């Protein structure tokens, strides 16, 4: 169809008290309000049972109560259950290097549960003029490598966007592809006053089972003294990136936003000896107070809407190549958590004012107005770490794994296409299709037959045959 996938702290983190799992949600009431509501409902049901005991079998009220209970049971049956999707995110400044031979540990391919959605953000992909032109004609080596790795496991590349060295890739389990819709990409340059794309942000937005999500991969200004500029650049990216959909015209209109990349924030004030001593002893908490991003989040209201898991892994910059040794060159760059993954749940228009304790927050509930939260979504961070085994770059890759707990707003494909009988090259083939009743059809709609290049994990390439959509049965 014309709308195919081709169109395409004091708050450093929040813990739910179970290990390092970090939770935020879009439920429309606090936990205490929910408990009060359930208690009131139980009381009303108890009163109703007492009334039922007093009713006679021929009482008119008996029939009315029975009808009311039947409607209540039907309403409960229509509420779709919560389901959990596994999101695996990677951010990695690859410093123009070619991909390593094996990315199994980076993608947690040998662990359970399996991932539903991969979102991979790279920075400093080789963008030398000849290399960049060749990547435009073919596929860049990183995209090709990830596709070759994930395709045999039935992942499909849903979308990608590149701006010079910035690359963002989205892969999905095949089963979810019909429910990933309204895919759009965009980018913003911030390098050289917005005229050069070596710095900036690239974004992919889409609807996942009806929930609007946006992923923003950024590479911000470098060096210790440019923390304010980094904040300004990110705010500029948020303000300038727009999309075609009326209900989500900007990044912050989406129900869930993930902000990640080489954000380039440093650890201020501390000397090299104190930094390395704290890192070697695993006392990372001694460095949090001087982490520039955590400091800026205390000052900037728009950054306070974002959450991040605790930084309980070694700073990921800067390393000697193919080693676990921090920079020994003449520059001797100080170690820093430059590579980060944060997320934001769309808040209500009037967020409640809450006093927040210093340090890592213990609870956090963000509220969303979307559909009055008939279909809430929760973001539960399971893992936030780096993988030190990769040495092709002076950065170590950072991994964030999330459980997306959601009630699906849509669980029916827009279009169902069913081949009838056995298809063979020397026989007529018949395919039938059905569309949802509220599907907005057009005379420009069409059905295309594609070669599925599973070896590259993407549906596309040469269109073998195209048919206009005019009837419900095509021959």
Model-derived regions: residue spans:
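Beta-strand-turn-beta hairpins that frame and shape the catalytic cleft
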Residues: 79-89, 166-168, 176-180, 199-215
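Internal catalytic domains of large membrane-associated glycosyltransferases
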Residues: 104, 138, 142-143, 147, ...
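A Trp-anchored, charged/polar loop motif used as the substrate-binding/catalytic surface
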Residues: 98-106, 191-205, 235-249, 260
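N-terminal, active-site-proximal structural segment of metallo-dependent hydrolase catalytic domains
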Residues: 1-160, 166-168, 234, 238, ...
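Active-site-proximal beta-strand elements of phosphoester/diester hydrolases
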Residues: 86-95, 171, 183-185, 211-225
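Active-site beta-strand termini and strand-to-loop segments that position acidic
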Residues: 173-174, 204-208, 344-345, 400-402
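Catalytic lobes of large eukaryotic enzymes
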Residues: 148-153, 216-221, 225-475
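Amphipathic alpha-helical protein-protein interaction segments
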Residues: 62, 78-80, 85, 92-96, ...
């Amino acid at each position: 169809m014309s709308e195919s996938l081709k169109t395409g702290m004091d708050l450093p983190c929040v813990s739910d008290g179970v290990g390092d799992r970090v939770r935020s949600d879009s439920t429309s009431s606090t936990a205490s309000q929910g408990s009060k509501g359930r208690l009131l409902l139980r009381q009303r049901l108890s009163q109703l049972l007492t009334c039922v005991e007093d009713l006679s079998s021929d009482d008119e009220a008996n029939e009315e109560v029975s009808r009311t209970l039947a409607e209540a049971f039907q309403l409960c049956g229509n509420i779709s259950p919560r389901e959990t999707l596994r999101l695996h995110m990677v951010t990695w400044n690859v410093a123009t290097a070619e991909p390593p031979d094996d990315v199994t540990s980076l993608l947690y391919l040998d662990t359970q549960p399996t991932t539903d959605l991969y979102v991979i953000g790279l920075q400093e992909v080789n963008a030398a003029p000849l290399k960049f032109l060749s990547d435009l004609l073919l596929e860049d080596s990183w995209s090709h490598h990830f596709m070759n790795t994930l395709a045999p496991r039935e992942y499909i590349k849903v979308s990608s966007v590149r701006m010079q060295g910035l690359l963002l890739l989205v892969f999905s389990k095949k089963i979810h592809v019909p429910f990933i819709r309204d895919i759009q990409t965009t980018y913003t340059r911030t390098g050289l006053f917005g005229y050069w794309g070596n710095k900036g942000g690239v974004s992919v937005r889409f609807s996942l089972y009806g929930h609007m999500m946006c992923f923003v991969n950024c590479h911000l200004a470098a060096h210790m003294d440019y923390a304010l500029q980094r904040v300004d650049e990110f705010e500029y990216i948020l303000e300038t990136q727009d999309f075609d959909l009326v209900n989500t015209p900007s990044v912050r209109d989406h129900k869930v936003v993930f902000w990640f990349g080489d954000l380039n924030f440093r650890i201020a004030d501390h000397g090299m000896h104190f930094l390395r001593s704290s890192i070697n002893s695993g006392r990372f908490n001694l460095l949090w107070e001087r982490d520039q991003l955590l400091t800026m989040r205390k000052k900037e209201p728009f950054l306070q809407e974002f959450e991040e898991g605790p930084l309980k892994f070694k700073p990921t910059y800067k390393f000697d190549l193919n080693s676990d040794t921090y920079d020994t060159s003449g520059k001797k760059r100080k170690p820093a958590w430059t590579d980060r993954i944060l997320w934001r749940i769309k808040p209500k228009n009037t967020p409640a004012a809450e006093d927040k304790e210093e340090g890592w927050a213990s609870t956090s509930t963000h509220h969303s107005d979307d559909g009055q939260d008939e279909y809430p979504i929760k973001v539960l961070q399971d893992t936030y770490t780096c993988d030190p085994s990769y040495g092709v770059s002076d950065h170590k890759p950072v991994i964030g794994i999330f459980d997306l707990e959601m009630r699906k707003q849509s669980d029916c494909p827009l279009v169902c296409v069913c081949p009838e009988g056995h298809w063979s090259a020397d026989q007529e083939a018949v395919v039938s299709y059905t569309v949802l009743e509220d599907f907005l059809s057009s005379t420009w709609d069409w059905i295309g037959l594609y070669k599925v290049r599973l070896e590259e994990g993407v549906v596309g390439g040469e269109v073998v045959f195209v048919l206009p959509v005019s009837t419900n049965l095509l021959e």
